[in-house]
From Swiss-Prot:
Top-rank taxon, per record: Bacteria
Protein name as annotated: Chlorate reductase subunit beta
Binding residues for [3Fe-4S] cluster: 146, 167, 173
Record domain 4Fe-4S ferredoxin-type: where: 6-35, 125-156, 158-187
Amino acid sequence: MSQRQVAYVFDLNKCIGCHTCTMACKQLWTNRDGREYMYWNNVETRPGKGYPKNWEGKGGGFDQEGKLKTNGIIPIMADYGGRIGDFNLNEVLLEGKADQVVPHEKATWGPNWDEDEGKGEFPNNHSFYLPRICNHCSNPACLAACPTKAIYKRPEDGIVVVDQTRCRGYRYCVKACPYGKMYFNLQKGKSEKCIGCYPRVEKGEAPACVKQCSGRIRFWGYRDDKNGPIYKLVEQWKVALPLHAEYGTEPNVFYVPPMNTTPPPFEEDGRLGDKPRIPIEDLEALFGPGVKQALATLGGEMAKRRKAQASELTDILIGFTNKDRYGV
């Protein structure tokens, strides 16, 4: 068990889908050595199939009795987009068998394949962005599934890491993670994942995806720091919710659900209806039954600000400075 736990809060009302977080992570950690297909950080358009494709249906996690599920599957490479970066260079440059450099395989999926598609028909369509990283769970299924004890939680901060010297490449962890955030390096024969940028954390720096976020949607810190934004958003105000808590892994990435600030959908007669554009049931399927109360709290605090009244919650969510948004 870790002595303390770092956690994240992502405010989905501020995410603009710019993928700066993804590129920061990609350039730092996964642009070489068999990691080309890996996106430890990715930003999905929801509703959508996500990355890897249909990850919500891959199984894994724990059952209601707390037992590790054994029904998880290992996504095939096509679910990630195929052999990314694998081109016919030999045929074109050395053998003269082709005139144009193209991938060996035609991609049928990728990390942004269904970007901005969402759900519904214009003008009643809707979508929002969902950034995803490893949840650094308090009860990680990947750890429970590993027979070589290669996966552990760092005692000082709860970050989940893989000991590469102990990993034997059995991929039970890939099957067990219900979020599809454990990857297998085919070149090295080892499992790899987001490491929470712990080399940066040890130097007092925030993770790269947090530090580079253009929309300032990311909050980061210790869960038990009562003066920090994580504790206040998760425990005090209860507006930040875990993704698929029913998986039983106790994730430490939380989300402020998107508010329905856009006009409601049109009725058949052309008038604006009274239903929210993003169906509440869609949000509850992701973030659980606390969505309605979280949205009600957010709406109430925003109403106070429109009346020129003070609101601690909106001040926290604005995150005026880096110090306001993160720190350990």
